[in-house]
Amino acid sequence: MRLIDTHSHLFLEEFSEDFPQVIERARAAGVTHIFMPNIDSTTIEAMLSACSVYKGYCFPMIGLHPTSVNANYEKELEIVARELKFSKEYVAIGEIGMDLYWDKTYLKEQQIVLDKQVNWALEYDLPIVIHCRDAFDYIYKVLEPYKKTPLRGIFHSLSLIHISEPTRLDVIS
């Protein structure tokens, strides 16, 4: 069986002690690819380093995670834009989306950030990796205008508990 890990933050400090062993166990279990989504500007270097060490096995994605969206989001987006412009090694825009589980303070900003990154996905012809926690209706409102575009990707952490209309799933099919 061939397995693909579509979402792994193994480059984070808490995994550094046994990172090589984790990679070997993943290979032994049949994992053929590991996709690594960025979180914010503080994790780009570690993510790229991990992907460099395991080139052809670990693949970098770039984006601003919704829980990292705050008053400083424009500066973070500038960094993502620069990475996209000057590096061709990114295989997707991620991890992007909305997360209202912990905090709703930056709800509007999360919508703005998601929309901007979806536009980049289309501009650079990259798939998206969407983090959706207690926010499907809001994400739907952002994605709905893109329904007839070549936008593609996957959902991660998809929680449908707060979905208002099941028919809204048509935006993702």
Question: Where in the sequence are the language-model features?
Answer:
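Single conserved hydrophobic/aromatic residue that forms the stacking wall/gate
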Residues: I161-S173
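Mid-domain alpha/beta scaffold segments of enzyme catalytic cores
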Residues: M1-S164
